[in-house]
Amino acid sequence: MDQGYGGYGAWSAGPANTQGAYGTGVASWQGYENYNYYGAQNTSVTTGATYSYGPASWEAAKANDGGLAAGAPAMHMASYGPEPCTDNSDSLIAKINQRLDMMSKEGGRGGSGGGGEGIQDRESSFRFQPFESYDSRPCLPEHNPYRPSYSYDYEFDLGSDRNGSFGGQYSECRDPARERGSLDGFMRGRGQGRFQDRSNPGTFMRSDPFVPPAASSEPLSTPWNELNYVGGRGLGGPSPSRPPPSLFSQSMAPDYGVMGMQGAGGYDSTMPYGCGRSQPRMRDRDRPKRRGFDRFGPDGTGRKRKQFQLYEEPDTKLARVDSEGDFSENDDAAGDFRSGDEEFKGEDELCDSGRQRGEKEDEDEDVKKRREKQRRRDRTRDRAADRIQFACSVCKFRSFDDEEIQKHLQSKFHKETLRFISTKLPDKTVEFLQEYIVNRNKKIEKRRQELMEKETAKPKPDPFKGIGQEHFFKKIEAAHCLACDMLIPAQPQLLQRHLHSVDHNHNRRLAAEQFKKTSLHVAKSVLNNRHIVKMLEKYLKGEDPFTSETVDPEMEGDDNLGGEDKKETPEEVAADVLAEVITAAVRAVDGEGAPAPESSGEPAEDEGPTDTAEAGSDPQAEQLLEEQVPCGTAHEKGVPKARSEAAEAGNGAETMAAEAESAQTRVAPAPAAADAEVEQTDAESKDAVPTE
């Protein structure tokens, strides 16, 4: 061995100490193999006992002070040093078998006698007995310089006896405490990260029925690592869970426990030092901590256990091993039964969930129906609110405040919108739109006043009612920027910041262009309303259509801008026509003259030439019709919605009027005749309704 260590460690009871020695006084520690962790190495150890390596042997000659000094080679062994060929196998039994085979071939040089003296020496002065370190590691590229020196395995020479009795002399060493100490050290060694590759198949040279090829020969090798680490504490040193052994003095090395794993070394077994491992219970209990060291470290031992358990263990042992961390086979079977029950439960839950989904769907349908009804009610309420809300149709501006609508009509935005519309429509039409919007808002103002006189203002519901202070709500005023679709608190600095922001200016320009295009479509839609068309024709003729027009066409058409009026049901039309006919008949009977049922001053144009000829056949009827024009106008103001329907029913009404004219020449007509006329008029009105 080229770079043999001058000594594994030195204990001294005197004050003599070399550089880097640990402690002074009763005992001093000269590092591992004279390696000083805080200074230079010192190979000249002046201590009571030294452990030396020869080039290829362990020199175990007894020195004067009872230590193991360098002497004649006791046995041949493979060199153990920081050579490139280093592989520390974790198999103690395989190493022992290797050494026994080598010793039998070499004649047992340095036999068990030297070992016995070493044991006695060790028992008296807490020193290592002579042992052989068999290096079974495969050749590595080079020694890891960062590997601590205590990571090498040095095994005791157990002699030629396979059961580890040290030549039969030291069978008393089968101390349970020492065995527990070795296992304790094994656990600590495994937790320190001193783990080597166990992939060399040549390590296993003996066919042990308890040792599978690569599984159960691993765990009891690292106790010898622990010997290197704590100076012999691994074989019988004291631990917190038991008194010190009777054969050894108190250990001077610190007891590190089991890296926080208490009780892991307290196996109640009298197993010899790593030989045979004949107790299945012992093998079962330490099996889970067997593999995965290179990857898992101290916390991850034994995560994947079932790969190595398939070699040797019966089912009961496998179940007992797995019970420490994983489920046993019995547990797995129980888990299978449980999983089956869980599957049935899952099916029941699925059925229940399906029924719940069906119920939820029914509830959703009911909720949808209720919501639809609520929407209709809200729509009706909004429609009623629109009838009393000031509005500018082309600008889509609405307000309940008269001052706001007046400001809007005089605003730059409104004027620019009308100017843009004037580029697409005639100027006269745009002027009519402006006049129409102004007069419409005047009518809304009158309607609002009438409602205020009839009904008192209802208090608005407080939306914050029921919201406590624990919700941290606060009522504030805010501005809604339609261009940016953003709510800004009504604070001057925030509003000004938003008004001068780049995004707002960009968005408002885009919104203005889009708004102008939309306003053109709205203006065309308003002008398509047939009532407004008539008003526009009058306006273009120079007449004032707003003085005699008391009906708001937009409101009559449900404020729709699509040019369609709100149609009434046939029953409503029939009722209106019937009321007009009855009134005309009563007036004819009383001699007051029947009012014309036409809804406008141009009934002849709509009714056709037949009506005109029929009306012109009697001069008295013509005179009566002329007298009835003002009454018809007044009735038009009172019943605006039945205007067109009454015009369509004018044919039957004129016939009734002619009959009323002829009735005036009669003397005191009987009431029965009047009733017959009323019934006839009712039948005619019903016939006139389907012709709509």
Swiss-Prot record:
It comes from the Eukaryota. The modification Asymmetric dimethylarginine is found at R109. Residues 576-593 are annotated as: Required for interaction with MYCBP. Keywords: Cytoplasm, DNA-binding, Immunity, Innate immunity, Isopeptide bond, Metal-binding, Methylation, Nucleus, Phosphoprotein, Protein transport, Repeat, Transcription, Transcription regulation, Transport, Ubl conjugation, Zinc, Zinc-finger. One of its GO terms (molecular function) is NF-kappaB binding. GO terms for biological process: cell cycle G2/M phase transition; cellular response to lipopolysaccharide; cellular response to prostaglandin E stimulus; innate immune response; mitotic cell cycle; mitotic chromosome condensation; negative regulation of tumor necrosis factor production; protein transport. Residues 168-203, 231-254, 269-382, 545-571, 592-692 are annotated as: Disordered. It is found in: Nucleus; Nucleus matrix; Nucleus, Nucleolus; Cytoplasm. Phosphorylated on tyrosine residues probably by SRC subfamily protein kinases; multiple phosphorylation is leading to dissociation from nuclear structures implicated in chromatin structural changes. Residues 572-589 are annotated as: RII-binding. A zinc finger (C2H2 AKAP95-type) spans 392-414, 481-504. Residues 663-675 have a biased composition (Low complexity). Residues 324-334, 551-562 have a biased composition (Acidic residues). The keyword Ribonucleoprotein does not apply. InterPro entries: AKAP95 (IPR007071), ZF_C2H2_AKAP95 (IPR034736). SUPFAM superfamilies: Porins. Highly expressed in heart, liver, skeletal muscle, kidney and pancreas. Expressed in mature dendritic cells. Residues 172-182, 281-297, 314-323, 634-646, 683-692 have a biased composition (Basic and acidic residues). Pfam families: AKAP95. GO terms for cellular component: condensed chromosome; cytoplasm; female pronucleus; membrane; nuclear matrix; nucleolus; nucleoplasm; nucleus. Binds to the PKA RII-alpha regulatory subunit PRKAR2A (phosphorylated at 'Thr-54') during mitosis. Interacts (via C-terminus) with FIGN. Interacts with NCAPD2, CCND1, MCM2, RPS6KA1, PDE4A. Interacts with CCND3, CCNE1, DDX5, CASP3. Interacts with NFKB1; detetcted in the cytoplasm. Interacts with MYCBP; MYCBP is translocated to the nucleus and the interaction prevents the association of the PKA catalytic subunit leading to suppression of PKA activity. Interacts with DPY30; mediating AKAP8 association with at least the MLL4/WBP7 HMT complex. Interacts with HDAC3; increased during mitosis. Anchoring protein that mediates the subcellular compartmentation of cAMP-dependent protein kinase (PKA type II). Acts as an anchor for a PKA-signaling complex onto mitotic chromosomes, which is required for maintenance of chromosomes in a condensed form throughout mitosis. Recruits condensin complex subunit NCAPD2 to chromosomes required for chromatin condensation; the function appears to be independent from PKA-anchoring. May help to deliver cyclin D/E to CDK4 to facilitate cell cycle progression. Required for cell cycle G2/M transition and histone deacetylation during mitosis. This is A-kinase anchor protein 8. It comes from Homo sapiens.
